Amino acid sequence: MESGNSFLVFCGTDTMYLAKEICDYLNCPLGNMNVTHFADGEFAVSYEESIRGADVFLVQSTFPPSDNLMELLLMIDAAKRASAKSVNAVIPYFGWARQDRKDKPRVSIGAKLVADMLSTAGVDRVITMDLHADQIQGFFNVPVDHLYASMVFMPYIQSLKLDELVMAAPDVGGSKRASAYAKYLNVPLVLCQKTRTRANVVDEIRIIGDVQDKNVVIVDDIVDTAGTICKAGDVMKEAGAKSVRAIASHCVMSGDAPVRVDNSSLEEIVFTNSIPYRNNIPCKKLKQLSIAQMFAETIRRVIKNESISSQYVIK
């Protein structure tokens, strides 16, 4: 697909690996943009080619959150001031998505604040994947194309050819996601009920459903410390599961998460490449699948004003 000057693709500092893949599928060059860093930690962005009258697509996941979000905001602002026809933020991983509501008094709703900041900067459209909560789409006053990692996970699961397959949710909050996989594959669903006394620390997990002699695939969206998903895997293995593996959209994997995964009962943990693996500790059980083709096809459909709904395997 030749771009001419009708559309241009640029990327932030930490998402170049994915943007290059997307451009390969679109058969277009990656745009030339410069990020200048100053001694005090401040930075500025500038486009090194004309973007006047072009549909501009900015590929940038917001992880690590603060710098990458600020870089994206500056990219959007610069594109608007350079007379781009439209500015489309392609955000495979949307940071702050776990702050989607007031779950206790006197807290902010970070996801809504970030949505407001992007809108104020001048974004015309957001393309993202597997938001932590679907309702975040409603925080924006511009169109949001919400993609699903099932496009890459479903073929992978089917390629494993597992008998006695069971899909599992690591907590009640993830039951809708896991249920969609179970329904599509026509297999049973298992739920985990967890108690957590403080953030990132899981005290106890109880299994709701039968995993005896089953091959279990746990479905999640974000794996941060990996405490929940590893404990769920261990509990299921103790309950007689034949094998336990996990799929998750976003590979945050903070702190000792790699050690926790490698020491757990999980056979493997499979992510998309919405964000790069940044932990200095290697993880032998980790695998990443590319979402570049899915995002490239979505960009193509946006440019051509074609329907995007066929991009959804399951929701």
Describe each model-derived feature in a short phrase.
Residues M1-K315:
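PRPP-associated nucleotide enzymes
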